[in-house]
Each structure stands twice: as C-alpha cells, then as structure tokens.
Amino acid sequence: MAVRAFPGGHMREILTPPIVFKCLADDTRARMTLLIAREGELCVCELTHALELSQPKISRHLAQLREAGILMDRRKGQWVYYRLHPEVPQWVDAMLKGVVDANQEWLSPDALRLAEMGERPQSPVACA
C-alpha cells in the first residue's frame, strides 16, 4: 500500500482506481462528488438541500470522501465547505469533469434543487 504525507503529518493511501471507484460506487457519494465537481465548492447545508437527505447522513458520506483524499473541507464561520482536494490526481479530476459533462440529465434533479435553494451561503469559490 502506497501512502503519502498530507499537511499536519496525516498519512493517506495514494488514490488508486479501486479506492476512487469504491468511494463513488455509493449513489449518495457519487451524487455529492459530482455536484461538488460541477459547482466548485458546496457547503453541507447545500448538499442536504440538493440531495434531500439528513445532515448526519450527508456528513457521514462527506467524511468518507475526505478521508479517502477525494474532497477537502474548510470552515468559514458556521459553514463547512467541501471541494475537490487540490492534490487529487489529474486523472481523477478529468474523470469527474467528464462524468459531469456526460451526465447532466442524471444530475439535473439535484442541480435544480440546488439552484432553487433560497438563502444559500456565499462562497468565494462558487462566486468566482
């Protein structure tokens, strides 16, 4: 098993196809990862609204994606935002963008709920 050091001394497995595909084999994790890849950055409340799932369920799935090294989070006030990890291999980034582009219809119910969400938190990445 190959590992790499992350800031703070944390060690993680290097993202291999089996790790990535195992994480994304779950419908909820696939939907949230693709929405994040599409939008750039989303907070927990936006994902809860878009996917129509409880906050604990969303947070549990986000933790798995973060621990795998696919996503990273940042806190701004009361909001926790998630985005693709900047050190995700290029092949993962390209694959996610390709899947988003090729599956707009599959993502459209979640994307529509997100677009219709009132009082979304302001994110510098989403507004850039």
From Swiss-Prot:
One of its GO terms (cellular component) is cytoplasm. Residues 11-103 form the HTH arsR-type domain. PROSITE patterns: HTH_ARSR_2. Could be used to construct robust and highly sensitive arsenic biosensors. GO terms for molecular function: DNA binding; DNA-binding transcription factor activity; metal ion binding. Binds arsenite and regulates the expression of arsenic efflux pumps. In vitro, also binds antimony and bismuth, but not arsenate. This is Arsenic resistance transcriptional regulator ArsR1. The gene is arsR1.
